[in-house]
Structures are given as structure tokens and as C-alpha cells.
Amino acid sequence: SPLRLALRRIELLKLPIYPNAWPKNPAREVSSVLLNELFYVGITAMRNWTGEIEIGRGRIDFGHASRGKLDHVMEIEIGGSSRLDSDILKLCMIKREIPTVTLSLVAPSRAIKKRCHTGKCAEEVSVRLRELEPVLDNVRDIIVVEFDVPTKGISGYTNHLINGKNRFKNDKQLFTRGATKREIRKFIEKNRKSFFI
């Protein structure tokens, strides 16, 4: 299925860290902007997957088309939590318009949330979906996918990290703040082998 293929790709992403770049939040070491762009480069590299698709008056993060017909829609929830409800509503409306489409929503694990100072973790997204079930049709059709990497001490820990502070010392702004999405995307594409297992 399209989702299964996307999940395999997501499992190959390396978490781009830059330790001690946020003095006011020592637990944080990941830019949510960089992580979002990493998802974009990884998923859109797959066959039949497209990013930033305009549907009606809204835009979805990713869509998979088979024989020219949209059959899977994916939203990535890494960043502010304020857009979660609107993304859920968007997915439900797409399901109403295209009953055969499948839906997924990717959110970080609780551990990743702490590291990138993002809005909602996958567990919290699942709770919100249950809260909205009585008032929104098609909410039950949304598959929640948790994005996670091994923690310290677990096998594969270092393989799933890319330390920008060590590997790209002159590109701190790309790992922290001050760079545009286009600049970050171009940087990831140029250094693709460093960001994927």
C-alpha cells in the first residue's frame, strides 16, 4: 500500500540534531523546519508521491496517486499545534469528496517532541481524534503514524542521527534558524546520503 511504502521511507530518515543550539531549552536539539523539509525530500522522492498539493481551497502535505487518481493523503504534524484541528478537518473533507482515499497523519513520539519543541505527539493526536469522533465524520478513517528513532543505549541509536554540529559546522543556520525552507530543502537534496540510512 502507499502508506506502507511511505513508512519504510520514513524509517530511513536520520534525526537532524544540533546540540546546545537552544540555550533557553536545553532539551531541544532539532529544528522542526528542517525535520519537515527532510520529510518532504524523503517522501517526494518516491514514485507517485507529490508534496504540497492544492485541493479545493486548502493544501495537503503529501498525496499518492495511482493511475492519475489520488488514493492516499498524508499530513505531517511537526511544528505548532494550532493547525492540528484544521488538518484533521481537511482530511475528513477529502474523505467525504473522495470516499476511496485513505488518510494518515504523522506525528512525533513523545521523546521526539521534547527534542524538537513541536506541538503534539502521536499519543496526543490520537486523543484529539477520539474527542472529535462525535462531531466529525470520517475521523475514524485517519491512521495515526508515530515517528520515532532509537533512544540512547538502544541498538541503532547512532545510525538514526545526523549531528549537524559535528558534520556541518559551517551550516548552523540550516540546522537551527535563519534559513528559508527552499535553502534547507536544497541543502538536504545536496547532502541526501547524510540524511538517510
Task: List PLM regions with ranges.
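Short, well-structured alpha-helical interface segments that form or flank functional binding sites
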Residues: 34, 57, 71, 83-90
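Active-site beta-strand-loop-beta-strand hairpin of nuclease catalytic cores
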Residues: 60-73, 97-98
